[in-house]
From Swiss-Prot:
Organism ancestry: Bacteria, Bacillati, Cyanobacteriota, Cyanophyceae, Synechococcales
Organism: Synechococcus sp. (strain JA-3-3Ab) (Cyanobacteria bacterium Yellowstone A-Prime)
Ranges annotated as spanning the membrane: 7-27, 47-67, 76-96, 141-161, 168-188, 220-240, 259-279
Disulfide bonds: none
Name of the protein this chain belongs to: UPF0182 protein CYA_1810
Main location: membrane
Family: Belongs to the UPF0182 family.
Places the protein is found: Cell membrane
Bilayer topology annotation: Multi-pass membrane protein
Annotated Pfam families: UPF0182 (PF03699)
UniProt cross-references to InterPro entries, sorted A to Z: UPF0182
PANTHER family: UPF0182 PROTEIN SLL1060
Keyword Transmembrane helix included in the entry's annotation: yes
Any single Gene Ontology cellular-component annotation: extracellular region
Length: 851
């Protein structure tokens, strides 16, 4: 027996030792990784906040649970009582420690400077304070509830379940103990009801999101009253505990056992509380909503509709949208086109999907190189802004031949991708393929474009950090890395950057081997004192590890600057706690700002975090929590700042909200008299909403502005009326310089018909010459793909451009074969954009050749 006990003790200590080593290895891996990024304060803030909150909660819970257990379990062993107390306290402490960031936000909150319309409290209370107080109230309630249940079970188990022993169990001391805990529960419910008042600002009862007439005039006073009722119920429980009241009236003696009579008084109090709550907070508001509000909805809900409109526009960054009428004078002519060559030279003829397929066929070079995505950017080349598309040539180890997927190759040989391919959006070769500015391995600037050599030179093309990089590698070791394949040989290299963690000591290798469950890290002879370990190289994982509280745009993009490659991330601060702000279906937030731009060095893996919207209260609080992490946007080098762009994910959300919330008159909003929608386009054999498009264009001139507008990089999306196809407006997000982040909406006159994208698409499909040519191609073994229909504002008119791609049935090399152009009621199809525009507008051009 003693051997068994000793064996169990040894097994227990061995298990604890394994857990300790695992925790130590995991912590060291994090510590070294954050140190590599110069972000140790971020890690220490996280650790200290979590452990500080957890230990504080543990001590408080242990005091509450332990004292109550010892009070009722007076004859029990100390070990048994403490085992229960430690178990409950540990679980409760762990649950509260998960909310450490809510505590930090509360401690570092900032005022928003605007108050809610119902309680008059600064919005910072709802963003920072209310979530923390609700978490704390719920935790305290759970603590007392679990204590009450535990104490009640101890009384029952300790004294048995017979009526005689139950009577003993419910002695005066036991009654008082349970009643005191019951009173504490109701006191916490009183606190909970008080906090529930503020939750009315997120009500979904009325015609719009947020507190409506019934919420303010019925639910709010009822919830306030219930807070008082819960407090009085708590006082009633404590009064019963002090007096030890039993219901020994003759009415009850005849049928009520002695032990049950002890529960009758608190049960009546609890029942009265529930009944009163049901009447006041459920039945009365519903009756008021049905009998008074619904028949007079617009009249009674009007001020609350105004609140919803104002706060939704503020929550989604739409409060400062500048709405202008689109100029109607004049029409588009050949002469006007010649004056807008900067726009025409940047018409995007390549869609991402066909261009990506072409890049993969022509430029991946080796099977283990992959182009995961195509991105859009702009560069100033020869003094002119040029829109380009590019893709990073990333290493995908999964594509290495299976026979070569060895541990050595995974860890030492296949370590990085190489360079990128870049082409202008509007240039096509005679074969219908993209004409590259930058291509091949090593990256080579096309001799046809010598002016781009200085701007697009790439001196360090190695991509050690990218979107497909999921392997952890050792660099600077004895083994050579594959740098890139040349024509008749392979070129090898050795990492010379600052990324990764040095592992010169055996104990470090031991911890990494333990953490990654890979004994070969400890045994490999390839490792040397100069070896660096690069892990967490997938760029999305990398930024999320540092700042998991930001929401990241799904489209990071690569930028060339100073011969190096950088990944740009758009990051958002979000909240679901902005009062009166309407949620979009499928999105968990009702407040969003693009407050952070993160720049990640593709060679070294370092990350710089810049505050793009210093007015955002959330990022102000984050900057207080992590004072050494964030930099002002002005600290970003100017050449990099020229590549900041308005993010598509944010713009999509704003466009969807603005389709409804451009209506600021409550009556118009209530009736949805002017509801807009995003037009659809036929893609992949089904109708899909049009996606916003980056364009370089010159915005219509403002008569009050002295100087003419210059070409600029914008993100554009059109609007049509709900269930209609004519265009009513278009929205643009500006991306350049001091105008970055400004939103413009140009509205068309309601008396003028402007063809929308779906109508233009229908005209293209119905054009006899175009339809005949497409059918002819399809009959000869080719597959015709119509690209994105582009809406291009030029001065006071709209021009539509749509590329057409041909792809062999058995091939994967799309070719840009034709360009369709449409203006007003005219449609043409020509081999090139210039020919299409000439056919459409030139006095000497053929109006409808449709070749």
């Amino acid at each position: 027996m003693q051997r068994l006990q000793r064996g169990l003790v040894l097994l227990l200590w061995a298990g604890l030792g394994i857990l300790a080593i695992t925790a130590l290895a995991s912590f060291y891996v994090d510590l070294a990784w954050f140190a590599e990024l110069n972000a140790l304060p971020v890690l220490w803030t996280r650790v200290l906040a979590r452990w500080g909150l957890g230990l504080g909660a543990f001590a408080f819970a242990l005091a509450v649970v332990g004292s109550n257990i010892r009070a009722c379990w007076r004859g029990a062993s100390t070990a048994g009582a403490w085992a229960i107390a430690l178990g409950l306290s540990g679980g409760l402490a762990w649950s509260l420690s998960q909310h450490w960031f809510a505590l930090l936000l509360w401690l570092h909150q900032v005022p928003v400077g605007e108050s809610d319309p119902i309680f008059g409290r600064d919005l910072g209370f709802f963003l920072f304070g209310l979530p923390f107080w609700e978490t704390l109230q719920q935790w305290c309630f759970n603590l007392v509830l679990l204590t009450l249940i535990t104490v009640a079970l101890i009384y029952l188990v300790e004294l048995g379940l017979s009526e005689q022993r139950l009577t003993l169990a419910l002695s005066l001391f036991a009654q008082r103990h349970l009643l005191i805990l019951g009173g504490a529960l109701f006191l916490l419910r009183a606190w909970g009801h008080w906090l529930e008042r503020y939750e009315l600002l997120y009500s979904t009862r009325g015609v719009v999101f947020g507190a409506g007439f019934a919420d303010v005039h019925a639910t709010l006073p009822a919830t306030t009253l219930m807070s008082g009722v819960a407090f009085l119920t708590a006082v009633g429980f404590w009064a019963l505990a002090r007096q030890g009241i039993r219901f020994n009236l003759p009415l009850f003696k005849s049928w009520c056992p002695a032990w049950a009579s002890s529960l009758l008084a608190p049960a009546l109090l609890w029942g009265a509380y529930l009944g009163f709550g049901l009447l006041t907070t459920r039945l009365y508001p519903q009756l008021l909503q049905t009998l008074l509000v619904t028949p007079n909805e617009l009249e009674l809900e009007r001020p609350y509709i105004e609140h919803n409109i104002r706060f939704t526009r503020a929550g989604f960054g739409l409060a400062e949208v500048e709405v202008k009428p689109f100029p109607e004078e004049g029409s588009l002519t050949w002469e006007i086109l010649q004056q807008n060559q900067s726009t025409l030279r940047n018409v995007r003829l390549w869609d991402t999907e066909p261009l990506l397929a072409t890049y993969r066929q022509l430029q991946e070079i080796r099977p283990y190189y992959q182009f995961p995505y195509v991105d859009v950017d702009r560069y100033r080349i020869g003094g002119e802004l040029r829109q380009v598309m590019h893709a990073a040539r990333e290493l995908d180890f999964a594509q290495v031949p299976p026979a070569a997927q060895t541990w050595v190759n995974r860890r030492f040989f296949y370590t990085h991708g190489y360079g990128l391919t870049l082409s202008p959006v509007n240039v096509v070769t005679a074969e219908g393929l993209p004409d590259f500015f930058l291509s091949d391995i090593p990256p080579r600037v096309s001799p046809r474009y010598p002016e781009v050599a200085q701007v697009l030179r790439v001196e360090q093309p190695a991509l050690y950090y990218s979107e497909l990089t999921t392997t952890d590698v050792f660099v600077g070791a004895e083994a050579r890395e594959l740098d890139y394949p040349a024509a008749d040989r392979y070129v090898y290299s050795s990492y010379r950057g600052t990324g990764g963690v040095p592992i010169p000591h055996l104990w470090q290798r031991l911890l990494y081997a333990w953490h990654f469950r890979d004994l070969r890290i400890l045994l490999s002879r390839e490792l040397s004192p100069s070896t660096r370990f690069l892990y967490r190289r997938q760029i999305r994982e990398r930024v999320r590890q540092v700042m998991p509280f930001l929401l990241y745009d799904q489209d990071p993009y690569l930028v060339i600057q100073g011969g190096r490659l950088y990944w740009f991330f758009d990051a958002y601060t979000t909240s679901s706690r902005y009062p009166y702000s309407e949620h979009l279906p499928g999105f968990p937030f009702n407040y969003i700002r693009n407050s952070v731009k993160a720049v990640l060095d593709a060679y070294n893996g370092s990350i710089d975090w810049y505050i793009a919207d210093p007015r955002d209260p959330l990022i102000q609080a984050y900057a207080r929590i992590y004072p050494t992490l964030f930099k002002p946007l002005e600290a970003m080098p100017e050449p990099l700042r020229q590549h900041i762009r308005y993010p598509q994910d944010l713009f999509r959300v704003q466009v969807q909200q603005f389709a409804t919330y451009h209506m600021t008159d409550p009556r118009v909003f209530y009736n949805r008299e002017d509801q807009w929608q995003i037009p659809n386009q036929f893609r992949k054999r089904r109708r899909l909403p049009m996606q916003p498009q980056y364009l370089i264009l010159t915005l219509p001139e403002d008569p009050q502005k002295g100087s003419p507008n210059q070409p600029e990089f914008v993100l554009l999306s059109p609007f049509t009326p709900l269930n209609k196809q004519n265009m009513v407006a278009w929205m643009a997000a500006r991306c350049d310089g001091e105008n970055y982040g400004k939103l413009l909406v140009y509205e068309f006159s309601k008396q003028r018909l402007i063809y929308g994208p779906e109508q233009v698409e229908a005209r293209v499909n119905q054009d006899p010459a175009i339809s005949e040519q497409i059918a002819l191609w399809n009959e000869h073994g080719s597959r015709v793909n119509l690209g994105t229909l582009l809406v291009i504002p030029i001065e006071t008119s709209l021009l539509y451009i749509q590329p057409l791609y041909l792809e062999a049935e058995q091939g994967r090399l799309p070719q840009l074969t034709r360009v369709i152009a449409a203006y007003e009621d005219r449609v043409v199809m020509e081999p090139t954009l210039s020919q299409a525009l000439e056919a459409l507008f030139s006095p000497t051009g053929s109006r409808r050749s449709n070749r």
